[in-house]
UniProtKB/Swiss-Prot annotation:
Species per Swiss-Prot/TrEMBL record: Nitrosococcus oceani (strain ATCC 19707 / BCRC 17464 / JCM 30415 / NCIMB 11848 / C-107)
Name listed for the protein in its UniProt record: Leucine--tRNA ligase
Name of the gene: leuS
Keywords from the UniProt entry: Aminoacyl-tRNA synthetase, ATP-binding, Cytoplasm, Ligase, Nucleotide-binding, Protein biosynthesis
GO cellular component: cytosol
Origin superkingdom: Bacteria
Pfam family, one: tRNA-synt_1_2
Motif ('KMSKS' region): 576-580
Coiled coil (UniProt feature): none
Gene3D superfamilies per UniProt: 3.10.20.590, HUPs (3.40.50.620), Isoleucyl-tRNA Synthetase, Domain 1 (1.10.730.10), Valyl/Leucyl/Isoleucyl-tRNA synthetase, editing domain (3.90.740.10)
Primary location: cytoplasm
EC class: ligase
Binding-site positions, ATP: 579
Length: 819
């Protein structure tokens, strides 16, 4: 055995063995317990970053451990390949998005293989391939038939120069990121999925996801946002009534105006005869559409001149256009109660609108100073006519009954969750399978004509989607009447692809159906791993898709992911690694210098998986030194005739040998719990390092000493093999084994080795530590007392004194009370 640790050579040999023997290829085996471990697949940006490496190392350690535990493990990998970055790169590099994407996939696949991840590459998929997105197009047509798909106009950010829709993050200071043009808010037709039809189940089923972090479940609960309230009708003379939803009907008597969005029909009608209002609406059109951006804007508005009739008092209140009301949320109209809503309060202060207090604190503890801010707490009604004196619950019931009796409102359950707009006016995405016919309307593409293939050889300049400029793509015939028709040129939101990929891994070779019976064997995913930034959108959409697929008979389970682990970020100098900060670390350079095992060991040792990991060069070097030390210790051991028959005779061991062997099996027990149950991989590694330190001090060259050392080294190599699989692959062979470690089960702690014959007890005199004794586990009380009083240092403190009482805390201490 070479005494020097040659990481690069060792890792190449191990990876060649795994590939040659297809060690990680998974197949269904009903006789074995399955374990499906999945890390969120990457966007093929070109190079792995340390966040990728951490995510995938965690998943690989879990997968390898479960394999050693006898589970039938599936760990696949693929590519979330559609999306905006490919379009941006196409503009910058003057290559088609497809070419850029496929080249990146090839490079990143090589990087993943170099890290030794135990993936079943036979199941690899890329979402930009027609044989993948064909099935989401098929699913869309089925949802269309079930009434879960519809089209309506929705607000988008429009770049008038590039003639394209911009994502919110592409709007910088109100201008398009590329053209610099002032961005407009436009209403354009968009396709939506009725995720709200599953809102109640998505909410209530969260209680059953006990393997998910509570933080993620809370984020989804808040996003779904179930609220009970009243839909109130404010009549407008000569117009349709304004429907307004409120969760605070107790404040209804304090309404002093109604706010509507700039896109509301009433606002547009008023603007036809009011040039100043028309200019204001145009100004609002140039504001980005996200809630977050609108929250930060200075509150602005204009009076429409229209009046709404208060449903209880009959008073007329003005209708204002406000820049913070979004048409895409609710009805695009909100009742304004400045005394009890801070946003309305700020708006009313700016425009001198009335502030009418109708809620007072229940007690003197709550402060209410309307000169400074709104009073937003619940309390008792004042200035509210017949409802004065009621508390919130009483007022809710009384006002609801009053409105329902008069046909001016009704109780409703509302959700913050909105239907999912899946249209994107972009090129690099899966085409939406709809044909537009002048006679028949929007018609889904028939199943036999799927997939609608995205043309990949296009010239992409970022100005309009190439699909709109390709007659050979959009010119078609109507599937229903055969007449001339136009193909939909919008593409799917990329969350569409990532909402069901986990299921396709079960049967990526099936060209006849989206998910086959193999899905029932593998699903749900047992362990899912990814960043908490995906807590709401991706994880919610995947849950929605899974329930849709269940209702279509494609899967049997109710949820896609049983357990969820959200790993922390990788930091350097206290900040998240990013190119803009110039604090990135190239995984490739790290691997080429130290080897993949060093990178894996550092990542798993530096922090628990759910916490942020601070990058440390010294930590990486320390991990490398540990592996070199392990290599040297094994090399020194095997030099002493490793092929000799070392038979461990437990009954013949002396006390020192028993003590060291107990340490070995304590480490096995701790690592098993830390890796298998607690996922505190760093503490498992720390325990293994402690065992290595004890091993270095274990100076026993007797045959039994050698046998114990062999057992200890085998345990260390097995315990480390999920974390540093390459070096362990080689060391297992050097320790005299012909079979590869990849097929060896996880070690079990020997209960007999853990059963201690003696224990150490602290001896106190009047509560102060004065010594320590070793006694037999079953030693009688008299023997323990005698040994404690005979301990030399203890004798100094009890000499000439009377022992009045002896307190023994089992397995911990003896306290001598003297006077």
């Amino acid at each position: 055995m070479d005494e020097h640790y040659q990481a690069i050579q060792i890792e190449a040999e191990a990876q060649a063995y795994w590939e040659q023997h297809q060690s990680f290829r998974a197949s269904e085996d009903p006789s074995k317990e399955k374990f499906y471990c999945l890390s969120m697949f990457p966007y093929p940006s070109g190079r792995l970053h340390m966040g990728h490496v951490r995510n995938y190392t965690i998943g690989d350690v879990i997968s390898r451990y479960q394999r050693m535990r006898g589970r039938n493990v599936l760990q696949p990998m693929g590519w979330d390949a559609f999306g905006l970055p490919a379009e941006n790169a196409a503009i910058q590099n003057r290559v088609p998005p497809a070419q850029w994407t496929y080249e990146n996939i090839d490079h990143m696949r090589r990087q993943l293989k170099r890290l030794g991840f135990a993936y079943d590459w036979s199941r690899e998929l890329a979402t930009c391939q027609p044989d993948y997105y064909r099935w989401e197009q098929w699913l869309f047509t089925k949802l269309f038939a079930k009434g879960l798909v519809y089209k309506k106009t929705a607000l988008v950010n429009w770049d008038p120069v590039d003639q394209t829709v911009l994502a919110n993050e592409q709007v910088i200071d109100g201008r398009g990121w590329r053209s610099g043009a002032l961005v407009e808010r436009r209403e354009i037709p968009q396709w939506f999925l009725k995720i709200t039809a599953y809102g109640e189940e998505l909410l209530t089923a969260l209680d059953g996801l006990t393997g998910w972090p509570e933080q993620v479940r809370a984020m989804q609960r808040n996003w779904i946002g179930r609220s009970e309230g009243i839909e109130v009708q404010f009549h407008v003379e000569g117009k349709e009534a304004l429907a307004v939803f409120t969760t605070r009907p107790d404040t209804l008597m304090g309404v002093t105006f109604v706010s509507v969005a700039a896109e509301h029909p009433l606002a547009r009608e008023a603007a036809t005869s009011n040039p100043a209002l028309a200019a204001f609406l145009e100004q609002c059109q140039r504001t980005a559409t996200s809630e977050a951006i609108l929250e930060t804007l200075e509150k602005e508005g204009m009076d429409t001149g229209f009046k709404a009739i208060h449903p209880i008092t009959g008073e007329a209140v003005p209708i204002w256009v406000a820049n913070f009301v979004l048409m895409g949320y609710g009805t695009g109209a909100v009742m304004a109660v400045p005394a009890h809503d801070q946003r309305d309060y700020e708006f009313a202060k700016v425009y001198g609108l009335p502030i009418q207090q109708v809620i007072a604190p229940k007690d003197d503890q709550a402060s209410c100073n309307l000169e400074q801010s709104a009073f937003v707490e619940k309390g008792l009604l004042i200035n509210s006519g017949d409802f004065t004196g009621l508390d919130f619950d009483q007022a809710f019931a009384a006002i609801a009954e009053h409105l329902e009796r008069g046909g001016k409102g009704q109780r409703r359950v509302n959700y913050r969750l909105r239907d999912w707009g899946v249209s994107r006016q972009r090129y690099w995405g899966a085409p939406i399978p709809i044909v537009h016919c002048l006679h028949c309307g929007a018609i889904p593409v028939p199943e036999e004509d799927l997939p609608v293939v995205l043309p990949e050889r296009v010239r992409f300049d970022g100005i309009r989607s190439p699909l709109k400029q390709l007659p050979e793509f959009y010119q078609t015939s109507c599937p229903q009447c055969g007449g001339q028709a136009k193909r939909e040129t919008d593409t799917f939101d990329t969350f569409f692809e990532s909402s069901w990929y986990y299921a396709r891994y079960c049967c990526p070779d099936n060209n006849a159906t989206m998910v086959d019976e193999r899905g029932d064997y593998w699903l749900p995913v047992d362990q899912y791993i990814g960043g908490i930034e995906h807590a709401v959108l991706h994880l919610l959409y995947a849950r929605f898709f899974h329930k849709v697929m269940r209702d279509m008979g494609l899967v049997r389970s109710d949820e896609p992911f049983t357990h969820l682990l959200t790993q922390g970020m990788v930091l350097k100098d206290g900040a998240k690694m990013s190119k803009s900060k110039g604090n990135t670390v190239d995984p490739q350079a790290l691997i080429e210098h130290y080897g993949a095992d060093t990178a894996r060991l550092f990542i798993m040792f530096a922090a628990p998986p759910e916490q942020s990991l601070e990058w440390s060069e010294s930590g990486v070097e320390g991990a490398h030194r540990f592996l070199k030390r392990l290599w040297r210790i094994v090399a020194a051991h095997v030099e002493q005739d490793p092929k000799a028959a070392l038979t461990l005779k437990v009954k013949d061991l002396n006390s020192e040998q028993k003590s060291f062997r107990a340490k070995v099996h304590e480490t096995i027990a701790k690592a098993s719990d830390d890796i298998g149950r607690r996922y505190t991989f760093n503490t498992a590694i720390a325990a293994i390092m402690e065992l290595m330190n004890a091993l270095a001090k274990f100076d026993d060259s007797s045959p039994q000493g050698q046998a114990i050392r062999q057992e200890a080294l085998e345990a260390v190599v097995l315990l480390l093999s999920p974390i540093t699989p390459h070096i362990c692959h080689r060391l297992w062979q050097e320790l005299g084994h012909r079979e590869a470690i990849i097929g060896v089960p996880w070690p079990e702690a020997d209960p007999d080795a853990l059963a201690k014959e003696s224990i150490e007890l602290v001896v106190q005199v009047n509560g102060k530590r004065r010594g320590q004794i070793t006694v037999a586990v079953q030693a009688p009380r008299e023997e323990i007392e005698g040994q404690a009083q005979a301990e030399p240092n203890v004798q100094r403190f009890i000499e000439g004194k009377t022992v009045q009482k002896v307190i023994i805390v089992p397995n911990r201490l003896v306290n001598l009370v003297v006077s």
